[in-house]
Amino acid sequence: MFGKGGLGGLMKQAQQMQEKMQKMQEEIAQLEVTGESGAGLVKITINGAHNCRRIDIDPSLMEDDKEMLEDLIAAAFNDAVRRAEELQKEKMASVTAGMPLPPGMKFPF
């Protein structure tokens, strides 16, 4: 039913994948990703856990419209989150290589 290696082999493979995923999640949490908006006038750096680490606002924007600045900050944050999720997906793909998982499944479970 389970083929060569049986259920024991499948369980061992699942345990190894779980250990690799745990290590990868710890590594991802330490990574930093920077999102930008306004052609780089607003930059937001977040870590892999999506915690904001830094915000850099070009001084020229401090004289401008408050609403525009708020929009640029939101856009930079969203860009940073998108980049962090792409990086996480790439890193996790190396861990799950060879394991049949449903498409679109996000980690952690």
Swiss-Prot record:
Cited SUPFAM superfamilies: YbaB-like (SSF82607)
In alphabetical order, the GO MF annotations are: DNA binding
**Primary location:** cytoplasm
Where does this polypeptide localize?
A: Cytoplasm, Nucleoid
**Which Gene Ontology CC terms are recorded?**
bacterial nucleoid; cytosol
Keywords tagged on the record:
Cytoplasm, DNA-binding
Q: Where is the signal peptide?
A: none
Q: Which family does it belong to?
A: Belongs to the YbaB/EbfC family.
How the protein assembles, per its UniProt entry? Homodimer.
Supply the NCBIfam families for this chain.
Answer: DNA_YbaB_EbfC
Q: Matching PANTHER family, A to Z? A: NUCLEOID-ASSOCIATED PROTEIN YBAB
Q: What is this protein called?
A: Nucleoid-associated protein HI_0442
